Amino acid sequence: MIALVDCNNFYASCERVFRPDLENKPIVVLSNNDGCVIARSNEAKKLGIKMGEPAFKKREVFERNKIKTFSTNFILYGDMSKRVMSILRNSSKEIEIYSIDEAFLKCYNEDLNTYGINLRKKVKQWTGIPVSVGIAETKVLAKIANHIAKKYRKSGVFILDN
């Protein structure tokens, strides 16, 4: 089986690691030169903030809803990604880093649900970054399972099997 571990709202989550006062508050991360929205917390998503929206068109919405905005900090995101991937490397013999916030892992553990839950706990505890884990027989199915796992915030793990 293959697990896809995907960091939740990665850039926004990285900002929150160093600003715990922003937990459960709406935040967005803006592109270079603060041009448009490139990352949102779940709270900002619920307020209707869309990816790619020009920031200047949303300034009033940001102020009215007390949405905290951040300029991109790619050095921070790269460092946090390395920390997450280091944990994942120690959790599987085979890992394929897919993007800055996603990796596929080969699962050797028979109890896949416990494996996924333990991965989530370890990454959150050691980095402060929340992740979702989708597990299935192929990478494509693991990606689908991960999408479903994101809807189950409590466990954050979904296993797609026969």
What are these regions, as identified by a protein language model?
Residues 1-162:
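Gly/Gly-Pro- and Ser/Thr-rich, intrinsically disordered tail segments characteristic of DNA damage-repair
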